[in-house]
Regions:
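Ligand/cofactor pocket segment of small-molecule handling proteins
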Residues: 1-40
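Structured C-terminal cap/extension of enzyme domains
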Residues: 29-132
Length: 132
């Protein structure tokens, strides 16, 4: 798993790794790029809140449908970054709560998402067509 977000490093890993060694992106924002370079998948935070769209993006990339993969990735791009405005999994839990999938309430050592990020994440959800 390469979670550096450095496409050059990911490309080098793919070039140097044995053929049977699978390379996964651990960085949502650069996941599509690594897939298109020959990566084998994405270990995704975004998939916790938009699993179908992430799956469709990965399938499109794997099948060579660059147009669809780019459209889907562009819809998810804000989530890829904004889900990290605070320590993971705090923003993810907030989004999933907004989706109505879990009740509110976070246990220590986690703390609630700072209110200053609510509108930012709501906007990212809208761009990804996530229903609340």
């Amino acid at each position: 798993k390469d979670a550096t977000g450095d496409i050059g490093r990911g490309s080098d890993l793919l070039r140097r790794a044995p053929k049977d060694f699978l390379i996964y992106s651990g960085d949502d924002a650069s996941g599509l790029a690594l897939l298109l370079l020959g990566g084998h998948g994405v270990i995704s935070v975004t998939a916790n809140v938009a699993p179908k769209k992430m799956h469709e993006m990965c399938v499109a990339a794997a099948s060579g449908d660059l147009v669809t993969a780019r459209v889907l990735n562009n819809q998810l791009l804000r989530l890829h970054t904004d889900l990290f405005v605070e320590a993971n999994p705090i923003p993810v839990k907030w989004v999933v709560e907004q989706m109505g999938l879990i009740r509110s309430g976070i246990r220590l050592p986690l703390t609630p998402l700072s209110t200053q990020y609510h509108s930012l994440l709501r906007e990212a959800m809208q761009l990804a067509n996530i229903q609340v």
